């Protein structure tokens, strides 16, 4: 089946698909606070989703392309769930968030198919994969159209991997008590086994969102990057996120001695946002298997336990948390009680001495991850490093911060 036919088949209208903003029905909806964050983007009036321009541009999307798609959504006069929110158009049609971003992805998919140069074709496939992921954002459970966009993203990513430099292998990992999970092993040129970083991504991202991290920061250092999806999304969708948030990553770590391209004696974990919750748990529970753990904007305690902090978080992000926890109909109070159990301090881990070297990078006044969380991580480690990342200029400082973090990881692996 051709890619074009696959797209038509997946998105063929069969019934009235639920609109993304209606999937989580929390009862205590409050006023939307203005939020700006380097890793999560910012709230913009009249949009349900946070607009994450920095990360989308970092992943290779042109700023003008972002504005063009947003303009098509804004200009639509189709029926919306909420007339005040542009990105709530009902049904897979013009103006719907998933439709417009997937349509943009198909443009690049067609370019990729027409391009004779393998590397350029690979770039186009990667671009399409990124756009399909934006279409599926924020990846709420039960969002049928988003799940179809994710399937197209994974197909495009696999096509890109066949053409881009280095080698990428799709790996299947067995997890006792449930379905196996799929990860991607990104390898630089050369002979292995290689030092390896296990990527622990945020709750509103897919494992295929981190190719830029591998290409710009790990591959030049001769380091492999292994990704898996967080519980409840993508290839890990059959697994619910629980207080044992690191369960899937632990089983992957234990399987690494059987992966011939990986030097299982030189492994680090790198966590973005809630992925840092996973990475820090690994630092405590699997310290013999890890040389280092790095975190960026970690969600390990305050956001999970502090009501005032939770009040500053946008509606969409609370919906993501509720969706991952399987609490689609919960009140904010019930969600708060459950989130508190995910705090690594409440679990009795953070605050105890940890032998694993840990670095934590943070931005001042980050609504999702205050400085105190990063200090808690680094002060708990026998070899901790605290890294403040200035906010402006945001893109340059983000790049500089990642260079410093990956350099720190390299010293502990190589």
UniProtKB/Swiss-Prot annotation:
What SUPFAM superfamilies has UniProt attached to this entry? alpha/beta-Hydrolases (SSF53474)
GO molecular function annotations of the record: carboxylesterase activity
Against InterPro entries, the record matches this protein to: AB_hydrolase_fold (IPR029058), FrsA (IPR043423), FrsA-like (IPR010520), FrsA_esterase (IPR050261)
- Reactions catalysed, as given in the entry: a carboxylic ester + H2O = an alcohol + a carboxylate + H(+)
Alphabetically sorted, this entry's keywords are:
Hydrolase, Serine esterase
Q: Supply the enzyme class, top level.
A: hydrolase
EC annotation from Swiss-Prot or TrEMBL: 3.1.1.1
Function, as annotated, reads: Catalyzes the hydrolysis of esters.
List, alphabetically, the NCBIfam families matched. PRK05077.1 (NF003460)
Could you say which protein family the record assigns here?
Answer: Belongs to the FrsA family.
Report what the protein is called.
Esterase FrsA
Organism expressing this protein natively: Shigella boydii serotype 4 (strain Sb227)
């Amino acid at each position: 089946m051709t890619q074009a036919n696959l797209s038509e088949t997946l998105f063929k209208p069969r019934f009235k698909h639920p609109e993304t903003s209606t999937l989580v029905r929390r009862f205590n909806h409050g006023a939307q606070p203005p939020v700006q964050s380097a890793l999560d983007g910012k709230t913009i009036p009249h949009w349900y989703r946070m607009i994450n321009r920095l990360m989308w541009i970092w992943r290779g999307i042109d700023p003008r392309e972002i504005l063009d798609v947003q303009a098509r959504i804004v200009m639509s006069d189709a029926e919306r769930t909420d007339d005040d929110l542009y990105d709530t158009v009902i049904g897979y049609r013009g103006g719907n968030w998933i439709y417009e971003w997937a349509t943009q992805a198909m443009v690049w998919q067609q370019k990729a198919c027409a391009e004779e140069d393998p590397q350029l074709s690979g770039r186009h496939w990667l671009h399409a994969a990124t756009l399909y992921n934006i279409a599926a954002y924020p990846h709420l459970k039960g969002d049928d159209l988003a799940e179809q966009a994710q399937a197209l993203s994974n197909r495009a990513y696999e096509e890109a991997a066949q053409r881009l430099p280095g080698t990428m292998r799709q790996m299947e990992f067995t997890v006792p008590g449930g379905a196996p999970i799929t990860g991607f092993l990104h390898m630089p040129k050369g002979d292995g086994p290689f030092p390896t970083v296990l990527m622990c991504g945020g709750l509103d991202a897919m494992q295929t969102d981190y190719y830029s991290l591998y290409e710009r920061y790990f591959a030049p250092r001769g380091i492999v990057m292994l990704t898996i999806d967080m519980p409840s999304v993508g290839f890990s969708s059959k697994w619910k996120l629980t207080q044992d948030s690191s369960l899937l990553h632990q089983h992957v770590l234990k399987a690494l001695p059987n992966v011939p391209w990986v030097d299982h004696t030189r492994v680090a974990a790198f966590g973005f946002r809630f992925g840092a919750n996973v990475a820090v748990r690994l630092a405590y529970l699997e310290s013999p298997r890890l040389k280092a753990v790095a975190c960026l904007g970690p969600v390990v305690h305050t956001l999970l336990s502090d009501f005032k902090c939770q009040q500053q978080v946008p509606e969409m992000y609370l919906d993501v948390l509720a969706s991952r926890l399987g609490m689609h109909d919960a009140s904010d109070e019930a969600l708060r009680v459950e989130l508190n159990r995910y705090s690594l301090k409440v679990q009795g881990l953070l605050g105890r001495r940890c032998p694993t070297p840990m670095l934590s990078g943070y931005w001042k006044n980050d609504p999702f991850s205050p400085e105190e969380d990063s200090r808690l991580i680094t002060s708990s480690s026998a070899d901790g490093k605290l890294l403040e990342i200035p906010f402006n200029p945001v893109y340059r400082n983000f790049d500089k911060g990642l260079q410093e973090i990956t350099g720190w990881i390299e010293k502990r692996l190589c």
